[in-house]
From Swiss-Prot:
Keywords: Amidation, Amphibian defense peptide, Antibiotic, Antimicrobial, Secreted. The modification Valine amide is found at V13. This is Uperin-7.1. The keyword Secreted applies. GO terms for cellular component: extracellular region. Uperin 7.1 shows antibacterial activity against L.lactis and S.uberis. Uperin 7.1.1 is inactive.
Length: 13
């Protein structure tokens, strides 16, 4: 889902 994308971005930051 889109939340997985959000967590991915959060981890990248």
């Amino acid at each position: 889902g889109w939340f997985d994308v959000v967590k991915h971005i959060a981890s990248a930051v």
